[in-house]
Amino acid sequence: MSAIPITPTKRIRRNLFDDAPATPPRPLKRKKLQFTDVTPESSPEKLQFGSQSIFLRTKALLQKSSELVNLNSSDGALPARTAEYEQVMNFLAKAISEHRSDSLYITGPPGTGKTAQLDMIIRQKFQSLPLSLSTPRSKDVLRHTNPNLQNLSWFELPDGRLESVAVTSINCISLGEPSSIFQKIFDSFQDLNGPTLQIKNMQHLQKFLEPYHKKTTFVVVLDEMDRLLHANTSETQSVRTILELFLLAKLPTVSFVLIGMANSLDMKDRFLSRLNLDRGLLPQTIVFQPYTAEQMYEIVIQKMSSLPTIIFQPMAIKFAAKKCAGNTGDLRKLFDVLRGSIEIYELEKRFLLSPTRGSLNSAQVPLTPTTSPVKKSYPEPQGKIGLNYIAKVFSKFVNNNSTRTRIAKLNIQQKLILCTIIQSLKLNSDATIDESFDHYIKAITKTDTLAPLQRNEFLEICTILETCGLVSIKKTKCKGKTKRFVDKIDVDLDMREFYDEMTKISILKPFLH
């Protein structure tokens, strides 16, 4: 009989000086690993300045470029467009009161208020017909009018009389073929109870309009009319379509008023002059001139008058207006610049106001957030948006130009300061504006060629250089215990082109080394 193996027992350790055996240790319990949730209960805070932020309200106001109503006037004229408004209204009043066809051609560079002004006139001066026929004026309007026509309105003449009109506004960009404009006009006015017709040319549209002669005047506004010439079709067909539209607006058997709008200043000379079989066939022309800097400034101030405060410094608005007026006179471009400066200002101030700026580590960043960021409002930054923020926006527009082109616009003093800034950056790549100014003073004193500028004059030129896209100025946190913020300056140019241009000027050579 074989012996049953006995599992050996572990020898119990005893303390060296103990008489009794030591108490056997308790068996170790395995610890359960605790895994924390990857997804936190809430996500990191997201900075915002509140839904009623003055910044958000200002940007929204600048977005509505078509709503340039003079709040202090009920006549429907846009700011700085009173003369053009009166010309359009006189044209409409005469054509509608006489129940005759006529045409008007409105032209001008982009952003001069052509579309906005016509939209304003249509909204304010063409009123929908009242549903109730109880008033004598309504009965008089509808006595000889087909109420089933679409877009039917009434137009009040200067003497108080009401005239029946049907008005529509069409953007020609949406048209695939120029000849489809006739069908588009018909679809805008057709009798809801009438048959569906195919309108392919002027004669078809004329046949539809003639029964309403002396009863209802049809007013058609064609925006971007020159697009009819750029469609994917032959120039002959495009020109023919445009000529037929203006010819239709001169026929005595219909009451058809055509208002064409386009950016092309020479469209009348190139195409409409072919109508000149008789001087009476040519459309009346109104030119919307580019806005001046003063007009742009007044429009912006007027738009912002509804806000509790204006967040821009007056000089910043004037500077932006002058730059935009000098280029194209496009008011929409000015709105874009102002909105862009607000966004830059917000980003910078949010960074400065953030209490967690620079304190997050990788363990605090959620890997798979499932809830939207917690929004927390912070005090809105004090102060107003100045020239430096406007300059940052303009610098983006000119950065595509070559360094040589940008330098050519500078005067000798501005070129000299640019040279000293570059030299200060060679000594210290993190140079601030103050350090660059100190280097400038030392360089001027050493050469004894020109009188040094004051600090505020130096800063003004730095702003100009930033506007030209040659330097960039950023507010950064300086190193050390003070933790204060300074304005760091840097350059954005092609150094080879820079030296090629600067070495051509003998007085600047000492500042290049």
From Swiss-Prot:
One GO MF term attached to the UniProt entry: GTPase activity
GO biological process terms on file: cell division; DNA replication initiation; G1/S transition of mitotic cell cycle; MCM complex loading; mitotic DNA replication checkpoint signaling; pre-replicative complex assembly involved in nuclear cell cycle DNA replication; regulation of DNA-templated DNA replication initiation
Outcome following mutation: residue 29 to R/T: Impairs nuclear localization
Keywords: ATP-binding, Cell cycle, Cell division, Chromosome, DNA replication, Nucleotide-binding, Nucleus, Phosphoprotein, Ubl conjugation
Subunit structure: Associates with the ORC complex and the MCM2-7 helicase complex. Interacts with CDC4, CDC28, DIA2, ORC1, and TOM1.
Protein's job: Plays a crucial role in forming the pre-replicative complexes. Interacts with the origin recognition complex (ORC) and MCM2-7 helicase complex leading to the linking of those complexes and loading of the replicative helicase MCM2-7 onto the pre-replicative complexes. Required for the initiation of DNA replication and then actively participates in the suppression of nuclear division.
Identification of the protein by name: Cell division control protein 6
Organism: Saccharomyces cerevisiae (strain ATCC 204508 / S288c)
Gene that produces this protein: CDC6
